[in-house]
Amino acid sequence: MVFRAVRQVLIPLSHAVYRPTIEGRENVPRTGGVLLASNHRSFIDSFAIPLATPRPVNFLAKSDYFTGSGLGGAFRRSLFTAMGAIPVDRNSASAAQESLDAALEVIKAGGAFGIYPEGTRSRDGRLYRGRTGVAWLALEADVPVVPVGLIGTQNIQPVGASMPRIAEVTVKFGRPIHPEAYRHLPAGKARRQLTDDVMAAIQALTGQEPAGVYNEVSSR
């Protein structure tokens, strides 16, 4: 209910200010578990995707966003909670598995979960190699993966910027990729191939230059 109320305020406001171009919304299933796998250019990405979809979307967010003090901390905590963000401690030794477990719980319950296979934001604009957690989730929960291409969000709030700016944004949703097509492969190969196909679909949507390597640079 809170998410719907926030959407009713933020969607008209964001559309009036940023006038985003949204393509392929029909590719997002209206019901049932689904993963939305996107490129990652900006802090604002986790707001752009939920505001462009026809249904609520959960994301992971640094636990720091939920622990701030004062009016600013309370506002940020309320906003992230209302947008369906799930706090995760990135410094925890078990952070990666906890993140996957949180996502698995959402999609097995029939929800939509947003994930960034690159692992962190791209500083140079290239599309980095995807990590196989997205494929593990899809195969484990037997849910489709909808590739998402974000264009222009890096101009709204680049890495290191504290305040958003006005810029054109495009959100593209590609056709769902279903895990059934990969089950004939050995588990490791299935995860790698599915992940590579998801990243190729994202690249086709964004036109980014493939980096060919993992993104090992922290964007914090």
What residues fall within each predicted segment?
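Catalytic core of membrane glycerolipid acyltransferases/transacylases, capturing the structured
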Residues: 15, 30-93
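A secondary-structure boundary/capping signal
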Residues: 24, 39, 61-62, 84, ...
